[in-house]
Amino acid sequence: ITTVGLKRLAVATLFACGIVHAQSTVPVMQPTEGDFEARDFHFQSGQTLPTVKLHYATLGTPTRGADGKVNNAVLLLHGTTGTGRAYLTPLMQKELFAAGQPLDASRYYIIMPDGIGRGGSSKPSDALRANFPRYGYNDVVEGHYRLLTEGLKVDHLRLVLGTSMG
């Protein structure tokens, strides 16, 4: 290795250490996670399940207006093959949820559900396999609606934001 090669290696090492340090100093927010069981779930295919588990993660705290209703809820929807945890990377937390950012978790109640068929929500591979009802996007939307209104008692959203099919 030449002197020039050693200098380049030293600069690259310092640069890499700086990136690792910068990423490690981002405060990581711990979400609250939960499951809601939607009872007597009717799929658009005409099939019904006695319960459908809908998994979710939240950041922030719900606040209620004078009418007692949650008034700071935001719904973030993942893409077709993702989960709600897609929004919980250190970079997303820093750019979206940190103090002063667009979805500051100290101001908003951020809800990140797993759609039917994904993550911790009910899906064919849980047990029913081929006997799991045929489901589509309308069923996923119905699941989100029931999670919000029945499970989390949220009937108004400040924002709905998604990636891809979210």
Predicted regions and their residues:
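Conserved acidic catalytic loop of the alpha/beta-hydrolase fold
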Residues: N138-R158
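Bacterial N-terminal signal peptides that target proteins for export
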Residues: I1-A10
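Catalytic nucleophile-loop/oxyanion-hole region of alpha/beta-hydrolase
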Residues: A127-V140
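Active-site loop->helix "elbow" adjoining a glycine-rich segment at hydrolase catalytic centers
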Residues: S164-G166
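N-terminal cap/lid subdomain of alpha/beta-hydrolase-fold enzymes
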Residues: A57-D126
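Catalytic-loop region of hydrolases
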Residues: A22-A73, G84-R85, P90
